[in-house]
Amino acid sequence: MSNIISQAGQKAKEALTSAPSSKKVDDLKNEFKETDKSARLTTDYGVKQTTADDWLRIVSDDKIGPSLLEDPFARERIMRFDHERIPERVVHARGSGAFGKFKVYESASDLTMAPVLTDTSRETPVFVRFSTVLGSRGSADTVRDVRGFAVKFYTEEGNWDLVGNNIPVFFIQDAIKFPDVIHAGKPEPHNEVPQAQSAHNNFWDFQFNHTEATHMFTWAMSDRAIPRSLRMMQGFGVNTYTLINAQGKRHFVKFHWTPELGVHSLVWDEALKLAGQDPDFHRKDLWEAIENGAYPKWKFGIQAIAEEDEHKFDFDILDATKIWPEDLVPVRYIGEMELNRNPDEFFPQTEQIAFCTSHVVNGIGFSDDPLLQGRNFSYFDTQISRLGVNFQELPINRPVCPVMNFNRDGAMRHTISRGTVNYYPNRFDACPPASLKEGGYLEYAQKVAGIKARARSAKFKEHFSQAQLFYNSMSPIEKQHMINAFGFELDHCEDPVVYGRMVQRLADIDLGLAQTIAEMVGGEAPTTTNHPNHGRKTINLSQTEFPPATPTIKSRRVAIIIADGYDNVAYDAAYAAISANQAIPLVIGPRRSKVTAANGSTVQPHHHLEGFRSTMVDAIFIPGGAKAAETLSKNGRALHWIREAFGHLKAIGATGEAVDLVAKAIALPQVTVSSEAEVHESYGVVTLKKVKPESFTDAVKIAKGAAGFLGEFFYAIAQHRNWDRELDGLHSMIAY
C-alpha cells in the first residue's frame, strides 16, 4: 500500500513539473513548497515538531491527566484550523480554474493600442475561473444556472480581467438592482431552501415583476444553463467595453469566446442525476482533460461598433440585457486561448484569485453601460471584503510586470518598500507618473452633457423583442427543452400567484409557449398577448450552429461494458481506437476485480456497474462474446445502463452477441439492429452482428456512413446526441 501511495504522489508531482510553464507560472514557483519524505514537520514559525498526534498533558502510568494550555504546537494547529475559512463569494462561490495562454493571430491595431490584442508575436499567460452563480461553494456542478467565465490576462502592461459569463446578457440593466436579483435567486430566507436552484417562488416572482429580466431568463431556461462541460461552452464579456486605438478613435465592443469542441449541453434528467451521483462532474472533467493533454481551446472574437454609429440600432448598445445580433454586428475572431496547466493548489490559486472588471490596460476602456459602471465598484469592493486591501499582492493576483506606487500598509501587506518617502511629489522625484509615451493609461476624452437624474433612455424600456428573437432562433429540439425547463421550474413554485403570473409573462415571448406551459403547470392559459411575437430570427444563438470544425471525439468519455467471456478482439480494437482519437475509454464490469476474456486474457475494469453510471460518459460500447452477453442480459444494472444512455440520447455501439443484448434492453421496433456482417445505424445505435477478422483492422475515419464499425460509431459520438430519438418520442417510451 505504501508503494502505491508513493507512486501516486510521484505521479502527481511529475504531472505538475511537466505541465507547460509561462511567465506567470515561473513567478509563482517562488511560492511553491514541496510536501515529500525529505521534509520534516514544523510549526508556522519554523520549529521542528516531534509528534502531531498528542497534546502536551499530565500523565502517569495508569491514567491520562489534563491537557496543558501551554502547548504552543497544539494551540497553533487548532488556531490555524479554526481560521482556515475566508468569506465565501456572495455569487460565483462554486468554481474551478486552470492556467493557460492567449495569443492573437490577427492584430486589432485598427481598434486598440493594447499590445495584448495587437502584438501577434506575444503569448500572454492567463488564469481562467469557471463557476456557477447561485450555489454555495459546496453545491453541485450540474445545476441549472448561469456559468461564470472569468479570464485574468497577465500582460506585460498590467493585469486585464475580462469577467464574463457563458450567457451574453444579464437579468438587470442597472447595477443598483444587483442585490435584488441575487437575493431573489438565492435560497429563500425563511428556510434556506433550495440550494443552487432557480426553481422556487422568489426567483420567478422577481422575473415577473422585473420585466427587463425576460430576455435573460429565456437563456437561463435554455440548454446554455446546463453545459456538458466547461470546455464546451461559450464565454461573453456581457457588458459593453470600449477600445481606443493609437489615433485616439474609440469603438464600442463586446468580447466573445467560442470553444474548439463546439457548444454542447447535458439533458435535464442527466443533469439532475449527476448533481447527486457526481457533484464535481464539471470540475473533474476540466482537470482530467488537461491532465490527459486534451487542452481546451477557445477562439477570441470582438464585435465592434464605431462611436459615431452608437445610435443606429433599435436597441441601446449599452443595455446589458440586449445582445448585438451577429447578422447586424459580425464577430471578428482575432485570437485563441488554450488552457494547459491545472492549479498546483486549489485554495491559494482558484479560491484566492480576485477578478475586477475595473482592471483594464491601456487601449481598453469602459462605456457608460450602467451595469458595468456598478460592477467596476462592486467587484473591487468585494475583493477587499474577502481577501483584504492587499489582495493584489497574493501570488495568483500579482502582475508579472513591475508594480510601483505609494500604497502602503494594511492587513497582510507583503511588499517591503524601501526608501525614505511614501508620497508624490517628493524631493527625489521618485516614482513619478508615466507619460503617454512611456505607456501611461490614456483616458478617452469623452464629452458628456446632460442633467443629473435617476432615469433611463427610451430604448432601455423595451424588454421583450430580444426574448422573442432568442426563442425564435432556437432549433425545434432546443425549443422543446425550453418548454420542459419552464415546466419543471414553475412546477416547483407552490404559490399560484407566482406560476399563474409567469404564464402570462411568457405570452410576451410567444403565445403558444405560454399556452403549453399553462397546461403543464396549472396556470390559466392566456388567449391574447400585448406583445405578439415578431417572428424574426438571427444567427449564432442556437447551439447547433457551433459544431467542431471537423467531427471529433476528442476528450469524450466512452464506457466499454464487459463481463467474463467478452470478445477481446473487439475490445482491444475499440480501446486502442478510442485512445488514439484522444477520447477516454472507461472499462466497466460487473466487478472491479479482473474480468477474463474469451481467449483467456484479463483486464481490470476502471469501475463496476454499480459504482459508475451512464450519466458520467458520452457513449457506451459493448463488445460481443456469448457468455458475456448472457451475463449482462441478466444484470438489471447493465440493462439500465443501456436504457439510460438511450434515454439521454447518447451513442450506443455493440458487436457480435451484444447486439441482441442492446435490442433486448431498448425493445423498440423503431430501433433496428444489424443482422449480418454490415454495420447498421439506427437512431444513434450502431451495431455489427457478424464480426469478421477485418472488421476492426481498417483505419478509422469519423464520418457519416463510414465503412467501418468504429468510424460510424465515433461519428455518432461526435454528434453529441441523437436528437431524432427525442423528436420522435422514443426516449420517453422506455423507463430509465
UniProtKB/Swiss-Prot annotation:
Chief subcellular location: secreted
Broad enzyme group: oxidoreductase
InterPro entries: Catalase (IPR018028), Catalase_AS (IPR024708), Catalase_clade2 (IPR024712), Catalase_clade2_helical (IPR043156), Catalase_core (IPR011614), Catalase_haem_BS (IPR002226), Catalase_immune_responsive (IPR010582), Catalase_large_C (IPR041399)
Domain of life: Eukaryota
Active site: 92, 165
PROSITE patterns: CATALASE_1, CATALASE_2, CATALASE_3
Cofactor needs: heme
Modified how: Glycosylated; with alpha-glucose and/or alpha-mannose.
Cytoplasm in keyword set: no
Pfam families noted in UniProt: Catalase, Catalase-rel, DJ-1_PfpI
Cross-link (3-(S-cysteinyl)-tyrosine (Cys-Tyr)): 356-379
Function: Occurs in almost all aerobically respiring organisms and serves to protect cells from the toxic effects of hydrogen peroxide.
Oligomeric form and interacting partners: Homotetramer.
Protein name stated in the entry: Catalase-1
Classification lineage: Eukaryota, Fungi, Dikarya, Ascomycota, Pezizomycotina
